[in-house]
């Protein structure tokens, strides 16, 4: 079946298409019902199927005689450590930690927060939750205490699994003090905290709440896989929304396993025994889908890399990993390639390593600018494939289906919509716009398997955030267009979520921190273009009347507050003091107009603006 046939079948007869795809995974009870639309718009896939995701990722490969195949390669330049786990070893460790969680009272449906760096134990903890039907919620290691506390209250975990520290190229980040602060701030109290001690920074243990990983494992008995319904949640992943309260994206077990298996074979062209490297973090959706679950479900070898594209030790770090481990396909964010290009513009490091095993480079997480695409294509001499998806979808919306039918690449486009995704560009009235014209990118319901069925304990917000604006469509929050060949072009967000180095951050959350400063009357944070990170936040503040504070001191205090309350990942560096913010007559801040002014673009002034002279002051300061 070629791409066009597969795509048309998926829209015309989704039950046949996804029913066939579902035969590629292992079921305890195969589904007889493929798509359940009885409670639309809450669609459910494989609603009467029963399976276990950990069994699909580990046990079935061991049972098939492939237990000695490498499952996970841990490569940590920051600790000078490397370790290979076979499928059998990873299964044993996962079963043991699953039993350890059971000994702490964790069972089917209970939540477990995982707050860890890029170490094998993070993967083991995720798979162990899946093994016993518990619901994991991974929080990016080193996220600020306040953000962690919000997620503790939202997920209400029985147990938190953490490590004593994470390791950056220039410093050790102690996690335990952040965890302790978060638990103190949160209203919900986790019953136990499991702490993996790392030699770089030992954590103080608070008994009886805290227990060390090694102590817990030493008395644990291995747990068997617990069968769960296909529609039971596998995990909740919190993503930045346009309000301070993060959205808990729910991933179900059945649709997730089916979609990820399909994507590995048909998009990424990776199968059993091949070496796959998603250079991301387990705290983000790419880490969930393509470091942990998808490569293991298809029986590939996945690489877990605790390092950076540059600085661990240099801009050749990625190419060293490719050579040393025989990587067949690499997936990272454009930011990583831009960082390497900045340090090594001529690509000298690329030529220092044997890259002959590498057949493709996949990029996603933010818009891929054509300059970066050309550089990577030229230096690596392999297809560089842009693709587009979201935390909410869990797997690509648009891609070049390399495993099915490689298509001509158009720089600046993530190619075409994948099966199950009926993508349209709509105008403000919900009408489809002609090819080449910008609109809100939306997906006609139902969404395919593997995408979010709802938000955690918040059906109303799921509807209001994604389904309300255009009847019968899911709102991606991105704007763009479709060309005459059906290729998609994604131009940017339509809301106040910005994309910093492939990480989604809410400007609203940053604004809340800045607005709390006693000298600030009001503020706005916008995302501005950055050569390396894609976007970085820039703050604009209006001072309270009579506020006597040095501008440089104010800037330092605000940058520090954002770093402490949100985390270094926020990357706020620039804060400008302005006399007023441009607003509509209804009081809405014109962020898009502000972005255009700051970036020097000539954009029409909205007719709804209250005071056009405010833009003049902004231009003189920009």
Show which residues each predicted segment covers.
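Conserved AMP-binding/adenylate-forming core of the ANL superfamily
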Residues: 54-55, 72-127, 144-149, 205-215, ...
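Conserved pre-ATP/AMP-binding loop-to-beta segment of ANL
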Residues: 68-70, 193-196, 206-238, 245, ...
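AMP-binding/adenylate-forming catalytic core of the ANL superfamily
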Residues: 139-164, 179, 323, 330, ...
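AMP-binding/adenylate-forming catalytic domain of the ANL superfamily
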Residues: 191, 195-197, 532-535, 564-589, ...
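Conserved AMP-binding/adenylation subdomain of ANL enzymes
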Residues: 257-275, 285-329, 342-348
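Conserved ATP/PPi-binding loop(s) of AMP-dependent carboxylate-activating enzymes
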Residues: 416-420, 431-466, 505, 602-603
């Amino acid at each position: 079946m070629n791409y066009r046939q597969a795509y048309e079948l998926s829209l015309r007869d989704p039950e046949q298409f996804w029913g066939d795809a579902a035969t590629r995974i292992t079921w305890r009870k195969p589904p007889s019902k493929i798509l359940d639309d009885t409670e639309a718009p809450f669609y459910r896939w494989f609603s009467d199927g029963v399976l276990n995701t950990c069994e699909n990722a580990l046990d079935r490969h061991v049972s098939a005689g492939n237990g000695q195949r490498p499952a996970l390669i841990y490569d940590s330049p920051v600790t000078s450590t490397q370790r290979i786990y076979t499928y059998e070893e990873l299964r044993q460790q996962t079963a043991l930690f699953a039993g350890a969680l059971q000994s702490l009272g964790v069972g089917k449906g209970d939540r477990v927060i995982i707050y860890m760096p890029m170490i094998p134990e993070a993967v083991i903890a995720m798979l162990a939750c899946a093994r016993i039907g518990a619901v994991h919620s991974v929080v990016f290691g080193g996220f600020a205490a306040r953000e962690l506390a919000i997620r503790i209250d939202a997920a209400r975990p029985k147990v938190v699994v953490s490590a004593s520290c994470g390791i950056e190229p220039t410093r050790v980040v102690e996690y335990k003090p952040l965890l302790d602060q978060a638990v103190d701030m949160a209203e919900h109290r986790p019953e136990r905290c499991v702490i993996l001690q790392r030699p770089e920074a030992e954590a103080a243990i608070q008994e009886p709440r805290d227990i060390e990983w090694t102590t817990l494992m030493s008395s644990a008995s291995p747990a068997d896989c617990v069968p769960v319904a296909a529609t039971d949640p596998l995990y909740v992943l919190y993503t930045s929304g346009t309000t301070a309260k993060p959205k808990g994206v729910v991933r179900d077990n059945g649709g997730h396993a089916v979609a990820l298996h399909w994507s590995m074979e048909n998009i990424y062209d990776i199968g059993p025994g091949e070496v796959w490297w998603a250079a991301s973090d387990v705290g983000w959706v790419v880490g969930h889908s393509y470091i942990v679950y998808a490569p293991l479900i298809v029986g590939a070898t996945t690489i877990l890399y605790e390092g950076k594209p540059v600085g661990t030790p240099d801009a050749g770090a990625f190419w060293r990993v490719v050579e040393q481990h025989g990587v067949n396909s690499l997936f990272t964010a454009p930011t990583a390639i831009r960082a390497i290009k900045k340090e090594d513009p001529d690509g000298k490091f690329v030529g220092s390593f044997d890259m002959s095993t590498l057949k493709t480079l996949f990029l996603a997480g933010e818009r891929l600018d054509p300059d970066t695409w050309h550089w990577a294509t030229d230096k690596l001499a392999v297809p560089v494939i842009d693709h587009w998806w979201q935390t909410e979808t869990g797997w690509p919306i648009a891609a070049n289906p390399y495993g099915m039918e490689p298509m001509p690449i158009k720089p600046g486009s993530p190619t075409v919509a994948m099966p199950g995704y009926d993508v349209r560009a709509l105008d403000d009235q919900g009408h489809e716009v002609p090819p080449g014209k910008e609109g809100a990118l939306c997906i006609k319901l139902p969404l395919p398997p593997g995408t979010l069925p709802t938000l955690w304990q918040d059906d109303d917000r799921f509807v209001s955030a994604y389904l309300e604006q255009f009847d019968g469509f899911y709102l991606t929050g991105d704007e763009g267009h479709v060309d005459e060949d059906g290729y998609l072009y994604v131009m940017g967000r339509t809301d106040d979520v910005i994309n910093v180095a492939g990480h989604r951050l809410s400007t609203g959350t940053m604004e809340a921190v800045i607005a709390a400063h006693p000298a600030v009357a009001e503020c706005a944070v916008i995302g501005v273009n950055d050569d390396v990170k894609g976007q970085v936040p820039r703050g604009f503040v209006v001072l309270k009347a009579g506020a006597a504070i040095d501008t440089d001191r104010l800037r330092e205090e605000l940058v520090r507050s954002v770093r402490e309350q949100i985390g270094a990942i926020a990357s706020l560096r620039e804060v400008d003091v302005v006399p007023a913010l441009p607003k509509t007559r209804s009081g809405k801040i014109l962020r898009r107009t502000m972005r255009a002014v700051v970036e020097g673009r000539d954009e029409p002034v909205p007719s709804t603006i209250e005071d056009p002279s405010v833009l003049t002051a902004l231009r003189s300061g920009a």
